[in-house]
Design a protein with these regions (language model features):
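FMN-binding flavodoxin-like domain, especially the glycine-rich phosphate-binding loop
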Residues: 2-10, 15-38, 43, 48-130
């Protein structure tokens, strides 16, 4: 994780996912972590980041419209990416679909829970590219 200096976390604005995003930040003490509600996300947030975490509580939240648009037209060259959600398969499939064109190194293990108990290991695995 030493080469990862800046991490971008984008969530859909729900209270539970905002709490997960804040907890995620605590597990990245060696990096600068920027947390954005999807409605506040801009394309310029992506390029300076060395790693990404994207989370939504249900598929296709309105707050992710700009994130979806930008990820379709950018190559992020294998940078690490973790996906988190409160819901099961539909949200996971949605999140995977929006990152597929960006050439990110997505952690296959998605964090599906509002619980932050096992978050540290998942964050480490994601940032190490496992």
């Amino acid at each position: 994780m030493s080469s990862i200096k800046r991490i971008l976390v984008v969530h859909d604005g729900t209270a539970d996912l905002e709490r997960v995003a804040e907890a995620l930040k605590k597990h990245c003490s060696d990096a600068s972590v920027i947390i954005r509600n999807g409605v506040d996300f801009t394309a310029t947030d992506l390029l300076p980041a060395d790693a990404f975490f994207f989370g939504c509580s249900s598929p296709k939240p309105a707050s992710f419209a700009e994130l979806e648009r930008v990820l379709k037209g950018i190559n992020l060259a294998g940078k690490p990416c973790g996906l988190f959600t409160l819901e099961g398969e539909k949200s996971v499939l949605y999140l995977r679909s929006i990152v597929k064109d960006a050439d990110l190194a997505v952690n296959f293990a998605t964090h599906i829970s509002s619980s932050v108990k096992k978050l540290g290991a998942w964050v480490s695995e994601t940032l190490e590219g496992r």
